[in-house]
UniProtKB/Swiss-Prot annotation:
Family, similarity comment: Belongs to the bacterial ribosomal protein bL34 family.
A biological process from GO: translation
Source organism superkingdom: Bacteria
Name used for this protein in its record: Large ribosomal subunit protein bL34
Keyword match Ribosomal protein: yes
GO annotations of cellular component type: ribonucleoprotein complex; ribosome
Pfam families membership: Ribosomal_L34 (PF00468)
UniProtKB keywords: Ribonucleoprotein, Ribosomal protein
Keyword Lipid metabolism: no
Organism of provenance: Aliarcobacter butzleri (strain RM4018)
Single annotated GO MF: structural constituent of ribosome
Alphabetized InterPro entries for the sequence: Ribosomal_bL34, Ribosomal_bL34_CS
């Protein structure tokens, strides 16, 4: 049986990347929440 997670950087960036997050209001909310929490990595 094939495992569910087959990592690839392109789709990863396209769905969870910084620019994608900044594109929507809710995405910006995610980034700000992670900033407030003090995350080292804000997006992928």
């Amino acid at each position: 049986m094939k495992r569910t997670y087959q990592p690839h950087n392109t789709p990863r960036k396209r769905t969870h990347g910084f620019r994608v997050r900044m594109a929507t209001k809710n995405g910006r909310r995610v980034i700000n929440a992670r900033r407030a929490k003090g995350r080292k990595r804000l997006a992928v």
